[in-house]
Amino acid sequence: MKKVLDKLFVILPFEKPFYDKHSMEVEYPGNPLLDEISHYSATQNKEEFLKEHNLGAKPIIALLPGSRTQEIKKMLPLQLSLVEKFPEFDFVVAGVSTHSPEFYSQYMEDSNAKLIYNNTYSILNSSHAAIVTSGTATLETALFNVPEVVCYKANPLSFILGKYLVKIRFISLVNLILDSPVVVELLQDLCNRDDLEKEFRKITFDENNRVEMRYMFGKLRNILGNAGASANIAKYIVEDLRK
């Protein structure tokens, strides 16, 4: 990379020190998710969303089972196991347009959870807590200040090889950026109904836990910086071209 790149722009703050160590010209201009969420916040109305989907009578729990077929097959049934146990909440599944209603219905036909397509930000903006499959969604959830539990279950061999090849303490972006176990990660064998229910109770009923997690989400925002990643990149490029 060093041989073919004049400058590298990264979207996660912990990436810069890594490339700095290899004497690469690298800049962290900010994370584009901050731009997306800032734009969303300026244009959306929470009350309209709740009214449109007949929500708001109960606290909402966001279920984000992922976007890939295999992860949804693994994660959605587990996440839906909470629905019957906690009737005091409205559970909302964040659906993605790459999967049909029929695909989701095979897991949801006996569930009182609601499926809403292509509205993840509106769901998070209205939620009391969230159960999230590991990925970018873990960071998005934190940026909406929603307490969360992260779930992930990979192929056992792939997981073992991954741990051997990549020496990292965490898999969620929230914990990686903060370098601290702020959100619970239920991985592999720990990704089961009993452990999920235990951690779910903490993020919904334990106010001290919720306050502490949100405090750390504030620190996360400070580390990420302000919105404007694309504008910052353009600024860097123009400055370099003028040299």
PLM features: residue spans?
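Nucleotide-activated sugar donor-binding and catalytic core shared by glycosyltransferases
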Residues: 1-243
